[in-house]
C-alpha cells in the first residue's frame, strides 16, 4: 500500500483517523466549535438545547408550501447548532454508548440517542428532496453531519438502521449527479471515511451491497430518485461513487484514489466485491484510457538543461504538471495490481497491454508515422525513451513489469519488428544525448534481472558456446583464473597512472631516503621507469594516501575496499534475484546417467562423417594412415579460429564440461542431437556428423598421441567444422563498438558505457564471465574481444600520454577536476548550497564565464569539469588507520548502512560523506556512482541540470541510498530498479538506477552540436587554460583516469565472483 503511505492526505489528517481527515479537521468551511469547552457544559443543558433546535427546524420542515430561502436558511442554521452540540457530546464521551436496554440508566450520549430514536436523519432527507434549487445546500449540511458521526462513532452507528438507511439513501441519490466543488469534497471525504471503517470491520461490507431494483423501486415510490440506467442487480454504492474522481487533480483526487485502493484491498477479503468490480464496474477501462490520455499530453520534447542529462528524475516530474498527473495515474495502476483481487488484477493487466502499452507506448517509442518511416526528430525519440525508462523505474509489481517485458519482446504487434531491437540500434546513435538516454534505459532493463531479457540480449547468442574454443570450455567453472584476471585488469592501467601512483605513494621504511638537503637530486625511481627530473607531487591524492596504498580522504577515489564491498553486495543481490530463473545457464559435466549411450551416439556420428569424406570408417586407424589422410584436409578459406582438436588426459577428464541447458527456448533450432535417454542442447549447438559433412568444411586434428584419442571425450558439435567466427549479438556488438571509441567518446557516454558493462559483470553467469572477467579464455567472435579492446585502449593512451612531466601534470589536473566535481555533486545532494566550497566557487564562476566567452566556446568534455582549489598536498600522510580519537574519521560500515537504508524522500546521508561521494557522479543507465568508476545501479538517481547563474546543483535521489563505492540501490525504483527481478522495482527501484553525471555543459549556442550550460563548465576554464597540452591530450587524460578506476572495479568484481564460486562449491 505504498500509494496510501505517500498520499498527501496522510499529511493533513490527524492521527486518530488512520490517516484520514476527520470532519472537524478537514472541513475548512465548518464553523469553529467549542470543542475544548465540552467539559464545562452541562449535559442536560446540551440535550435540552439540542431538542429545542430540532423542534424549531422540524416546524419549518412540516410546512406544506415549497420551502423558501428563509426556510432553508433556518433549517441549515439549526442543523449547524445541532452538529455543534453533537460534537461537544461526543468529545465528552470517551466511547460512544448506543441505546441501552436498561431503562433506568441515563444514556451516555442523550443527543445521539434522541437523533436515532426520533429518526431525525430520515426526516431530514425526506424534506431535502423537496427543497428544489436549495437541495445542494441542504445536502452539504447532511454530509457534514454524517461525516462527523462516522469519524467519531467509528463502526457502531453503521449497525443501526435509523443511521444506515438515510445514509444509503443520500449516497444512492448522489449517483450520476454533478455537484459543486465543495459538495464533491464533502462526499469524497465521507466515502473515504466509510472505506476506512469497512477495512477495519469487514463484516459490515454487506450493508453497502444492496439490490438496486428493490432499493430504487422503494425510492421511486417516494419520488426520490429516477430508476437506474443499468440492469445490474447488485451495486457497491461506495465504489460506484468514487469512480468519477479517479483522475481528478489535487487533494480530491488523492482522497478518491485512496478510498478506491481500500476498496480494491477489500476485494481480497470479500469475493463479492472482487466479482462486482471485475464484471460490473468500468474501473479498469477507465484507468487505462485515462492513462493513455494523460500520456498524450506529455511534452513531445524535453528541455535538456545539462550536457549530461540522461533520465527524468522525481524533481523533473514535479516541475512538469502533465508528467505529475501521468505518474499519479501510473502509480495508482501499479498499486491496484498490487492489492486487488486476482480477477481485477488480470483484467487490468490485459487492458493495460492491449489499451495502453501496445497502441500508445509502442508507436511513441518506435516513432513511426503512417508510412512506417522513422521520424528524424531526435528530441521526440529522447523524450519517448525517457518516459519509458521512467515508467520501468516507477512500477514495482512483477505482473506489470512482465507486461512491459512482453511488450519489448513482442514481434506480432509491430509488423514483425521488436521494440528491443530498435532500442539496441539506438545505442549506435551519433547523437550523444540519445545514446546516453538509451544506455540509461538498458541499465534499467538489466537492473530488472529478468531472465527473458537476458536471454534475448546475450544468452541466446552465447548458449551454443561457439564464442569459446573447445579446448577452453573446460575452464569455465574453474576458480583460479578469476584471481589471475584481477591481476590482469590491474596491469592494464595506463603507464602514466601507474607512474603517478608511484610518485604519490609515500616511501616505505626500507626504501632509501634521499638526503634532506639534496633538493635538486632526483628521487630514487623504480627500475622499470626512466628517471624524471623534479617530478611534480600529485595535488589530488598525495595528502590522502596511507602506508597501505589505500586512499583515505573524503573522496572514494582509488578506494579498493569500497570497490570490493560494492562488488560483494551487488553480486549477492544479483545472485538472489537470479535464483528465481527457470534455468541456470551454466556449463555442466556430462550426465552420469546414460553416458555410455551418449558417447556411442557421438562416436557413430563421427564414423558417418569419416565415411562420407574419407571413404571408410577411420575412427580407429593406424598412425601413418591417419596422418596421411588428416593432414591432407586443409581448411577451405580462413581458419575457423578454433584451436586444434585436443585430447584430454585422464587427470583432466573429470573437468571436461559441456553445456547442458534444460530449456525449451534456447537452441530449439540448433539441437539436432537427440537421444532416448537425454536431450543435449550442448555448447556445440547440436548438429550431426552428416549435416556437418554436407557443409564440406575442413577441420584439423592434432597428430600427437592420435592412437590415444578418445572421441567420446571431445565436445563434439557442428561448430568444430564451422568456418569463420560467430557473432555475440547486436547488443554486445554495439557495446563493444562504443568501447572501441572510448578515447573519442564524451566523458558522460563513457561513464554510462562502463557502468553498463559493470552491471553485466555482476551477473552470476559463467558464460558472461567468459567474455568479461576471464582473460585466460580466448574468444572467437566477429569483433575484438573485451580484453583485446582494453589492451588496445591501454596502448592508445600510453602512446598519446607518455610518461613525462607534462603528462603527469595533465593527469593530475584531470584527477583534481573529477574529484572536485565529485565533492560538488555530494554537496548538491546534501542541499548544501552554503558550503565553503560553494562560496569559494562563486567568484570563480563569474570569471570563468567571461573567459569562456572570450575563448570561443571550447567544445571539450574536459572543459566541462570544474577545477576548484585542489586538496592541499603534503609529502607524507599523517593518517593512522588505527587512530580512534580522530573525530573526522568516518566509519565505512556506518556510512554504508545509512546509504542502504530506504527513504521515501530524498534524504542525503549526513554522516556518510566519504562513503557517498562517488554517488555524486552517478552514471545514468549504468548507475555508476564514481566519477572514475563505472559501477551501475538501478535505483538511485540524481538530477544534474542546474542553473549556472544560481550556482546550485540540484541532485535528486529516488529513494534509495548510495553505496560505498558510489553505487545506488533500487527498490523500487525504486523504483525499485523490479526490481527487479521482476520485483520492481524488485527492489531496484529501482528506486533505481543512479545517474552518474554531473552538472556539466558549456554555454548554449545556435549550432547543431551546441550543448547546454551547467555548473561544471563555468568553473574550469581558468585552470584548463593554464594547463599544457592540446584539447585532445586533456580528453585522453580524462579517459585514462576513468579507465584506471574502472579497471580497479573490474578487478574487484573478478575477485568477488571467484569467492562466490568457491562458496557455491563448498555448499
From Swiss-Prot:
List UniProt keywords, sorted A-Z. Phosphoprotein
Is Phosphoprotein tagged as a keyword?
A: yes
Compositional bias (Polar residues) spans?
Answer: 1-11, 859-878, 918-949, 980-996
Compositional bias segments (type: Low complexity): 842-858, 893-904, 950-979
Q: Which residues cross the membrane?
A: none
Entry annotated with the keyword Iron-sulfur: no
Region (Disordered) residue spans: 1-31, 503-525, 832-1013
Where Phosphoserine occurs, the residues are: 508, 835
Report the coiled-coil segments. none
Recorded family membership: Belongs to the FHIP family.
Protein's UniProt name = FHIP family protein GL19323
Say which species the protein is native to.
Drosophila persimilis (Fruit fly)
